Amino acid sequence: MVGQRAQHSPVSLLLLIHLCLLHLRASGQPHPTPEAPVEEVVSVQGVRGGSVELACGSGPAPLLVLWSFTPLGSLVPRPVAVTDGAMSKVEAIASALGVVSLRNSSLVLGELHEGARGHFLCQVLHVAGGQLHAAYSHLTLAVLVPVSKPQVRLSNPSPVEGASVVATCAVREGTEPVTFAWQHRAPRGLGEALVGVTEPLFQLDPVNRTHLGWYMCSASNSVNRLSSDGAFLDVIYGPDKPVITMEPLGLTEEGFWASEREEVTLSCLAASNPPSHYVWLRDHTQVHTGPTYVIARAGRVHTGLYTCLARNSYLDTRTQTTVQLTIYYPPEGQPSCAVHPSPEAVTLLCAWPGGLPPAQLQWEGPQGPGPTAPSNVTWSHAAAQLPSGSVFTCTGQHPALAPPALCTVMLWEPLGRPTCWSTATMGDQFIMLSCEWPGGEPPATLGWLDEQQQPLGGSSSSMAVHLLQAQEDLAGREFTCRGTHLLRTPDPHCHLQLEAPQLDVAEPRVSVLEGGEAWLECSLRGGTPPAQLLWLGPQQQKVDPGTSGFMLHPEGAQLRLGIYDADPAHHRGTYQCVARNAVGNSSQSVLLEVLRYPAPPNVTISRLTYGRHRREVQLQWAILGPGNLTGFLVQRKASALGPGAGAWETAASDIEPESRGRRLGGLDPGVLYAFRILALNHHTAGHPSEVKIPADPPFSAYPAVLGAAGTGMVVATVASLLVFQYAARHPETFPRLETPTTTPGLDPAQETTDSPVNVTITVTATP
């Protein structure tokens, strides 16, 4: 009965019962039911901001569930929520715990607050065996707080190397126990854990440059684990003593070396924080600022002491390092090889002076390497042990040159034999004996010998020259040139015999027609030294290449003389071909005859008359007798009868031989001219014709009369027509003498009228 009433009682009754139960429970009095209530104690954990469900034990369906909360440190319970299964009520004070709701008999706390930390009591009324029973559940709720994001604090973020630094990992909140861990990461490295450091703070004493970098800490508890952002520990240090490096690298005992004309890069590094400021000095003079000094094209002037100054601007500390830089340069050009022969041995010389350091030279021959020395090296060999074609190489090595420089000598004997010749010098005052034997290494030695095999002067290499005073008694004498070479036995030689020149002419007598072309030929036969050929004209004058009317044409040992447009007055006569050398001369004569062409026939003028206005004449002529001709020549002059008589001048030339007439213009009407004509056979002119003066053309009246008559007839005809026209229009002007009779059968229109008409026609003839 009690259970049924309880199920149907209002909430106010429930709360009243609840309060009673709380009162009884709080007062420690026993439950009014005959049996003691069942109690359960449970510990529950929740996370702040999270959700937790508090269960109210297990058993039969409750009639009433009452939840209360007692904060830590308090003895007074506070009602939280009540439900009878149909209705539920959450007290306003429950918001301090979070978002409170009931799920059946369980109390659900969402968005858990730290204020929910304490003791929860669940009281349940239920019916069992027809009796009302009360059950109690005690729950202790622990609210856990996650650790907050830790923060690293450094006692000195920028300490000087050697000082003391304390690092602290600060956490604002978090349920104990909280565990700490530390990590260090260099600026250009990976992070590494600091083993053994688990406290919220640790000390670096003394601090050094290896401690520079980022420091991070992490904090963790039973709820979570968070890591801090990095805090940078900037350790101030340096600068250390600078270290100088060079590219490309070349090391010497004093420092570095570099090749001339290459790019050289000097780098300076001094460990420092903040980074060092660098200054470069060359021989105590500043040349650059910055860690790298580049010499774009190294030269010899760049040799010297280079100092790198490093400065820490924060600490105002300085360090420096000095090195020696030497610019190497090879000797100029290439090694030079030379051979100095002697009768029984050969000396090989190799020289390559200059350079820094001096080049190292070494000989190498067919049997292997030879001596070595700087700048120059000498090697001697017995001539008997050296076959022709032996090759010797001198190798020059220098640090500034990648490939070695070489010079090579190949010993070989010259080909063939010596060649001898002679020439005259200084106007044939001296005779130069020359001897040549080219090729060979070393070159052959040559010397001249007289007829008694006595040396003439000294000897020389490859070519020997000896001068003799020119005189006639040298003709017929023989000289010998002897050559010697260490690889050639016996000694070869050549002979030279001096002799006067001899001449031959193709034809001693040459004929040519006037105006033609003639060639005189002269050939040189023998002569040592070589002779000079020339031609002398009929007046013994020398014919030069530029002489007018002549042409010289040398062909080997011949000298041809050409005569153009032969003229008897200038070209006829005896020509001499002369050959001269330093030991004698000779000459040959050639007679040149210039023949005239036969005379052409005579010419007579058949007609010579003036043209219009006396400014031209018409000339006609005729040939008298047989003969060859090639043209005509017309001449004129002012007649002696006129005011200005003068010499004959050409009026027309180049007239074809077939022509028999010519119109000549360009006359002055005020001058009286005389004309004559000549026949031409090439350059031969015939006898002039008779001299004639132009005549006026004859008068002809017949054409004038005919012209006048024709003109009169035209005028008469025109006048008659005019008279007839006038009479027809004015008949009264002309009276009739009698009346005409009419003939029967005659048409009036056919009547004739014999009216006389007088017409006067005047004809004037002008001659």
Swiss-Prot record:
- Designated name of the protein: V-set and immunoglobulin domain-containing protein 10-like 2
Q: Does the keyword Glycoprotein apply?
A: yes
Where's the Fibronectin type-III domain? 599-699
List, as start-end ranges, the regions of compositional bias called Polar residues.
739-754
Species assigned in the record: Homo sapiens (Human)
Q: Which gene encodes it?
A: VSIG10L2
Disulphide-bridged cysteine pairs: 56-122, 169-217, 268-308, 435-481, 522-577
Q: Which GO terms describe its biological process?
A: cell-cell adhesion
User: What PROSITE patterns is this protein classified in?
Assistant: FN3 (PS50853), IG_LIKE (PS50835)
